[in-house]
């Protein structure tokens, strides 16, 4: 099959064919805003041509740094949160063995890529230190500013660990900072200490940054082919340029989401039938939620892992509130297949499946779920992908990025800012006693005591 295809055939009872056509003028306008820079947030559109217009010299430095880390480290600790975490984590999970972390070094062949700075759990940090043990390791700290609380705390911990193990000079040779090109606390410290540095481009927001050094260095260290990742994204960039809805499946997805949203389907479940796509949904949730959830509107992004979650969420999806729509990422060709074996006893009633490939069973489950859920009043869309490889992943990343950008403009918002994330941070800094936030902290404590 082709690398990616979008299937809207299960929407027939929910969307009249004329409705998609009526969206064309709005989609064309949204496309113009995106490509001509006339829409809100225009300064953050550099991801749009990133698959073909990127810094080739930096790309070569990323590949060289990855080889060095592979040569001198058994573990790479990637420190970041949000877009500085989810893209790389998603790709490592998507492209590697389902039990990647449990593989032996000989089987894995490349360093184990682990993640920190994505929570404030002290137990997680302690456990990660325990897992690293006496193995050689390097650190990739990712932050535009260098002052984001979670990664900054984690970096202090792992920098100290490096210095205790290798000395200051040895530690500095194992630290790689992905940060602003010219300014910020992390950039200043990196230049002073001589760390290897890579750039977070000014015109690329965190949730759109997986195809920059933010994602590419950890992905390359894991042993994945980042040239193929970029090639897949470049193919998608070339594919999704025509705003004609009969020709552009990414724009179809954006249009259908908005049609359904306006009919009251306000929550979208991104679903998969492969466990190693769990983090794909986490990455997508930030991409969609942070792009669209503003001005008291927007589709709420959620996720489910099938068939597992059919045994927990299945009842609600089938008969709960009718505010759900589903988008399934369906894999056509798994990396491995296993057949249902024959057995002496048919105590489990599976004789009728003997000799069948488990992936075939998985596909029939998917077909049955689509039929049941649409009958129950839940619209279902499917994004079919050919394989779990780098080219396909790059293509899929770009599909979702351009679709979400168009979807945001269709809903009349700026898809590239995130002003709402500052509210909790201001309160947290007040409660932590950060200089400059004391008054806020005192007010909050008073309110909480009352």
Curated annotation (Swiss-Prot):
Statement: the UniProt record of this protein carries the keyword Lipid metabolism: no
Origin superkingdom: Bacteria
Keyword Acyltransferase: no
Coiled coil spans: none
Pfam families in UniProt: PGI
Subcellular location: Cytoplasm
Family matches, as HAMAP family: G6P_isomerase
Pathway linked to the protein: Carbohydrate biosynthesis; gluconeogenesis; Carbohydrate degradation; glycolysis; D-glyceraldehyde 3-phosphate and glycerone phosphate from D-glucose: step 2/4
Similarity comment: family membership: Belongs to the GPI family.
GO annotation terms (biological process): gluconeogenesis; glucose 6-phosphate metabolic process; glycolytic process
Main location per the UniProt record: cytoplasm
GO function terms (MF aspect): carbohydrate derivative binding; glucose-6-phosphate isomerase activity; monosaccharide binding
A single GO cellular-component term on record: cytosol
Described function: Catalyzes the reversible isomerization of glucose-6-phosphate to fructose-6-phosphate.
Source species of the chain: Limosilactobacillus fermentum
EC number of the protein: 5.3.1.9
This protein's name: Glucose-6-phosphate isomerase
Record keywords, A-Z: Cytoplasm, Gluconeogenesis, Glycolysis, Isomerase
Catalysed reactions, as listed in the record: alpha-D-glucose 6-phosphate = beta-D-fructose 6-phosphate
Gene: pgi
Active site residues per record: 290, 311, 425
InterPro entries named among the record's database cross-references: G6P_Isomerase, Phosphoglucose_isomerase_CS, SIS_dom_sf, SIS_PGI_1, SIS_PGI_2
